Regions:
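Surface-exposed, polar/charged faces of alpha-helical domains
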Residues: 47, 53-57, 86-90, 113-116, ...
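Low-complexity, intrinsically disordered terminal/linker segments enriched in charged
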Residues: 163-198
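Early exported N-terminus immediately downstream of N-terminal targeting peptides
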Residues: 31-107
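N-terminal secretory signal peptides and thylakoid transit peptides that target proteins
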Residues: 1-16
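Hydrophobic h-region of N-terminal signal peptides that target proteins for export
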Residues: 17-23
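Sec/Tat signal peptide C-region and signal peptidase I cleavage site
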Residues: 24-28
């Protein structure tokens, strides 16, 4: 069983792939296309990890990877839960910006622990609305763990990651809605708290 600190570190590697919008026409994504996409993402993550950048530069680079490989607007709305439906456009915009930075710092902080590690794609299979790409993530000096990337058949982006049975998408929603409750249901207060934690 993977320990919590190791799970958090591995989550940092796969945090670019949590959720992308499921609206719009289907792309009829092939397994080969999904594999190629995940391989490209993994290569960019490894390149960033091994770049020798400072922590601040790593966080910024990770935020760019999130923007490139995931629909961050949709991720933020999903994580916020039902409260997103009643939020004003201004509240949602401010929250989304804060959430994006918060997420990049949260997972980016674990990057250095993976220097010298890698992600190896094992194969892919079709699912209802996605192609599931199976991989093995191996931190330096530790055993490899199973990671499943769910790539949307509608927009070609990764919309969820299952890391040793842990659903990263629902994990983020649980954490953000809990923070929202702690802030009395105020989205503006939640936004301020996310900024404080970033």
């Amino acid at each position: 069983m993977i320990d919590l600190s190791r799970r958090a570190m591995l989550a940092g590697l796969t945090g670019t792939a949590v959720l992308a919008t499921l609206s719009g026409p289907a792309l009829a994504l092939t397994e080969d296309q999904a594999v190629s996409y995940v391989q490209s993402m993994a290569a960019d993550i490894e390149k960033t990890i091994n770049s020798g950048r400072s922590d601040a530069q790593m966080y910024k680079a990770f935020e760019q990877l999130l923007n490139q490989y995931a629909d961050m607007d949709t991720i933020a709305r999903f994580a916020l839960g039902p409260a997103a439906r009643s939020a004003s456009s201004g509240e949602l915009s401010a929250y989304t910006a804060a959430f994006r930075t918060y997420l990049s710092k949260k997972y980016g902080a674990r990057f250095r622990e993976f220097i010298g590690g890698d992600i190896q794609v094992q194969g892919a299979r079709k699912d209802k609305r996605a192609v599931i790409v199976s991989a093995r993530a191996k931190p330096r000096g530790q055993s490899a763990v199973a990671v499943d990337f769910h790539v949307s058949d509608r927009n070609g982006k990764v919309f969820n990651v299952i890391l040793e049975g842990v659903n990263l998408l629902t994990t983020e929603r649980t954490e953000i809605t809990s923070l929202l409750d702690q802030q009395g249901g105020s989205i503006s207060n939640l936004t301020a708290e996310l900024k404080r934690r970033s």
